[in-house]
C-alpha cells in the first residue's frame, strides 16, 4: 500500500518514521519542506504540494494543526482535493472540532474519495514505537493501522459518517 502523510509536526514525523521503519512505501509533504529532509534520508519520497502527494498514493494520512490548516491543505489551489482523488482513502488524525470533520467529509466524498477520522491517544514516543491508540471509523482504514498503533478500534460510523446526509 502506498501511503502519504501531510503534516510533519512532531506527531506526523513520528508516525512517518514508524511507517518507513516497518517497510511501507511513503511519500510526505509539509508546508516547511525542511521538516521532510530527515524522512527523505530515511527513505520517504517528497511531494512538492499536497495535490502531488494525493496523486502519488492510495491512502493519505493528515495530521494538521487546526481547521484553517485542514482547509488550506485539502482545498487550496494545489490541495489534496485539487486533482482526481476518486477511490482514494483519507485518514484524518488532526485534533479539531466535529463540525470541521463533517464539512471535510462532505468535500472529500464529493470528489469520490473516502474519509475516516482517526483521533489518536499518545505522544511522540508511542507514535515512534507504533503504540498509539487509534480510534477510527470504518474497517477500510485498518490495513495500515498496525504500523501506527498498538491498539486500534474500528468504531463503526464516525462523526462524518453519521452526518453525511445532514443538511
Q: Residue locations for each model-derived region?
A:
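Alpha-helical elements of the RecA-like P-loop NTPase motor core of helicases
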Residues: 13, 37, 68-72, 102, ...
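Residues in the short beta-alpha loop(s) of Rossmann-like NAD(P)-binding domains
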Residues: 31-32, 66, 139
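Short low-complexity, flexible loop/linker segments enriched in glycine and/or proline
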Residues: 41-44, 61-63, 108, 130-134
Amino acid at each position: 500500500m502506498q501511503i502519504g502523510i501531510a503534516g510533519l509536526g512532531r506527531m506526523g514525523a513520528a508516525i512517518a518514521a514508524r511507517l518507513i521503519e516497518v517497510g511501507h512505501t511513503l511519500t510526505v509533504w509539509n508546508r516547511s519542506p525542511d521538516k521532510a529532509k530527515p524522512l527523505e534520508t530515511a527513505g520517504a519520497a517528497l511531494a512538492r504540494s499536497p495535490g502531488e502527494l494525493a496523486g502519488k498514493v492510495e491512502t493519505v494520512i493528515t495530521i494538521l494543526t487546526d481547521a484553517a490548516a485542514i482547509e488550506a491543505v485539502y482545498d487550496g489551489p494545489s490541495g489534496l482535493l485539487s486533482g482526481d482523488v476518486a477511490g482514494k482513502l483519507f485518514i484524518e488524525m488532526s485534533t479539531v472540532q466535529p463540525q470541521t470533520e463533517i464539512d471535510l467529509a462532505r468535500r472529500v466524498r464529493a470528489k469520490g474519495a473516502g474519509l475516516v477520522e482517526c483521533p489518536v491517544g499518545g505522544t511522540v514516543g508511542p507514535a515512534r514505537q507504533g503504540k498509539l491508540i487509534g480510534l477510527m471509523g470504518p474497517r477500510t482504514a485498518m490495513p495500515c493501522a498496525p504500523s501506527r498503533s498498538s491498539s486500534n478500534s474500528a468504531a463503526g460510523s464516525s462523526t462524518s459518517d453519521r452526518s453525511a446526509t445532514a443538511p
